């Protein structure tokens, strides 16, 4: 919900799982959120940009979180396609 100034005033804004598009509930304590840093290709240094991925507890419980993060990183161009 937004006020007249356009600022969010909700106490809780739910996240969505990056792999399955499920809403991550407030009581899903098995979910994770990870920031993957983007690195300069020449110098190998962090360039102040990152991608954020949220993985719900159901994906982690199935053991698919590592494959999901790798697939998302390949789609975003963080990891090369032939890795």
Curated annotation (Swiss-Prot):
Pfam families documented for this protein: Ribosomal_S21e
Keyword check for Ribosomal protein: yes
GO CC annotation: cytosolic small ribosomal subunit; rough endoplasmic reticulum
Keywords per UniProt: Cytoplasm, Endoplasmic reticulum, Ribonucleoprotein, Ribosomal protein
Gene3D superfamilies per record: 3.30.1230.20
Compartments, record wording: Cytoplasm, Cytosol; Cytoplasm; Rough endoplasmic reticulum
GO biological process, one term: cytoplasmic translation
Superkingdom assignment: Eukaryota
GO molecular function terms attached to this record: structural constituent of ribosome
Keyword Phosphoprotein tagged: no
Function field: Component of the small ribosomal subunit. The ribosome is a large ribonucleoprotein complex responsible for the synthesis of proteins in the cell.
Family (UniProt): Belongs to the eukaryotic ribosomal protein eS21 family.
Oligomer and partners: Component of the 40S small ribosomal subunit.
Protein name: Small ribosomal subunit protein eS21
């Amino acid at each position: 919900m937004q006020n007249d100034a356009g600022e969010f005033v909700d106490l809780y804004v739910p996240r969505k799982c990056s792999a399955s598009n499920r809403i991550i509930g407030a009581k899903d304590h098995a979910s994770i959120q990870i920031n993957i840093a983007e690195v300069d290709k020449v110098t190998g240094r962090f360039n102040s940009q990152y991608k954020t991925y949220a993985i719900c507890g159901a994906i982690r419980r199935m053991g698919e979180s590592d494959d999901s993060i790798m697939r998302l990183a390949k789609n975003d161009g963080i990891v090369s396609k032939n890795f």
